[in-house]
Amino acid sequence: MIRRLPRLAPRWLALALLLLGSESAAAPGWRARLEPLFEAHCLTCHDADEKKGGLDLASLAWNPADAGNQQLWTKILDLVEQDEMPPKRKPRPPADLRHGALTALRGALHHDSLERQKRDGRVVFRRLNRAEYVNTLHDLLGKDTALQGLLPQDPTAGGFDNIGAALNLSTEHLERYLQAADSALKAATVTTPPPTRAKTRLDYSETWHDWNHGFQTTSWAVSPEGFLAIYWGGGGPSHGTLGAWSPPVPDERYRFRVRARAMITKEGHLAKPADQARPDRNIILKLALTGESRASAPYGEAFHEMSPSEFGEFTYEATVPEGHTLYVAPHRIVPAAAKEKPMERGLCAVVEWVEIEGPLYEAWPPAGHRLLYGDLPLVPENPAEPEKNLRPYSRQPDADAARLLRGFLGRAFRRPATEQDMAEHLALFREQQRAGRRFDESLRASYKLALCSPAFLFLQEKPGRLDDFALATRLSLALWSSAPDEELLRLATQGALSKPATLRAQTERLLASPKARRFTQTFLGGWLNLREIDFTQPDTKLYPEFEPYLQQSMLRESEAFFETLLRDNLSVRNVVHSDFAMLNERLAEHYGITGVKGDHLRRVPLPADSHRGGFITQGAVLKVSANGTSTSPVVRGAYVLDRILGTPPAPPPKDVPSLEPDIRGATTIREQLTQHRDQPACAGCHAKLDPPGFALENFDVIGRWRTSYRAIPEKAKDAIVKIPGTDIRHYIDGPAVDPSYTLADGRAFRDIDGFKQLLLAHPEQLARCVVEKLSAHLTGATPQFADREVVTEIVARTRPGDFGLRDLLHAVIQSRLFLHK
């Protein structure tokens, strides 16, 4: 060491001067405790000469105002703390030296992070994201107006689309907000007398046949019995379109009942029950909405599983826009099996009738109209047409406007309206009146101004502890993705919401509401990336059994599983492994589990030898962590490290090419990665990435269990796998799957079951990850260094209950992370 001193002295002195010149207020002299560790174990590789990994510790300053600088210091701390640095082949630092240096650095990072939070808050001044904006208008005005497509998509950070630091505001946003507010206000304004709620039953074969006559005639037929038989729903959106019906009152809710069944035709007729040969699988009936054009894609899909044993009645409820109608189509019928005589083809969906009820409403005028115009009378614009173009009428326009605006602004701004608020919006109302606008038009202009103002678009939070109104907004956005309701605002007015017992009770109330489903969807969309379930389309040759209904069932499975964990306060161990799954018949069939019938999800005990259980073996998770053609242990490994363990890997170097899958089956992904890992620059990261990815290799891109890879043959005739009931050949069985691997710490596993056990040995890591993901979603800010202490406290506090999910949620909401800006 003495012999090295002259060579090391210049950089040691530079390091000392640099550290001393950037002292934190945390604990004077804390950097002196880093110098011995850096000098003895770090500078050999990380000085100005070597600079391995691009890191020069000899010139690295301390700058609390620079987020990138603090992230780099945090990375240094984590690498040393996790014993990844120094490298395994290097001498280990003495325990007391390592402990002292880490304690000093951890304290400095915590102090400066906490000071920033006290000064500026954890969450930057943020706006409502797209879903929050749409839900808020829907709940405020009571109209399910189609606004989602009007607004730009939100960027994400840490997987979530409500993170304030990522939510920009552009001129496009402002233009779209004006359009959306105008559309929502007009839709909420009543202009007709109460519509008649009617129930109509239509002969489906007649209405459908008239609309689709001469189109895709090999896809459908009207049987001699008068039923409509549909053979293939995949050729175009007009298959099954109820073309003779349109909503008598657009943009209201309607309930559709469809009587249908799966059936087999025999010699041009529907086979009698005694002659029915049961189809090898049920047919899925899809109900959706579509526009008048045959090119209109259906949306708002709902699926029902039809049995061949008897007719069933299937219900679908939706808000129907103008120019839209019902769309019915069967799934799981092979389109390539079509023949010129459809009634001789066999398996089909038979529709007897469709019943339509609506419009459905609780009161008239609806609640949204009453919020805007109170109990003002509706009078016709033209007395000669007493039931057309009704308008709210006021004898005292100024007084009524002031009364109505105060109530509206209090709901829209999520706090009582100030006198300045009232003055600004009344001024616009009076200006519109002077310009000759009608009362309702003038009032809507003021409402539109409110819905495009910062008080509506942005969260009103100040550094420090949130006031009760800000707390009400944060709680409702967290669990409902919407504005607080009247009860939350009433408690905020009383100053009672911030009391721990009241806050807990309100958390329970919000979770019990149907609107809490938004929490399930948005949280899982960010945490597990389920919002990207549609981003890939599995290759139809390799995965011909994949279909929209299977995908919807996968998504519903994960959502129902999360809701079960939350409702029953089950342990976060279930994230990795559970002894049950939420299944319907289609999913059970896909997973190879017997005894499940029907399209409704229910809790199903898993067989002892099942490889399923937990989020990581669910179809939706396995689909979003793969592309449409192949699985990648690297991609899935990164997914598990980030989403399940909370240790996201660093992004790959820009000069490292991605691996292209060999869909011909000549080379396995393990063989490709072995060559890739032999490169020194790649080995370190892959030691962490590859094990969890290979543990999941027995699951293909659609979540099916496999023991071999599917491959596409050079010649189609060489394919050995057929679609049932057809002559279509798709793929061959390729090389065998090998899911075994060894973790970076030396622990080995043979398959997913063994890997799960290794993860379950450290449930506190699973809990910590869930707490960090919850805090990001609930507050709109990704984890910061000062949050680590709070997260550790929450994990410790919930350990006696085995880290129950509901306990974790309550603990986050009652913590400084949630209660402070």
Which functions belong to the PLM regions below?
Residues 19-29:
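Bacterial Sec-dependent signal peptides at the C-terminal "C-region" and cleavage site
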Residues 28-50, 68-75, 79-84, 88-821:
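Low-complexity, glycine/serine/threonine/alanine-rich intrinsically disordered linker
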Residues 1-8:
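N-terminal secretory signal peptides that target proteins for export/translocation
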Residues 10-21:
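Bacterial N-terminal signal peptides
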Residues 58-61, 86:
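Residue-level detector of conserved, well-ordered beta-strand and adjacent loop positions
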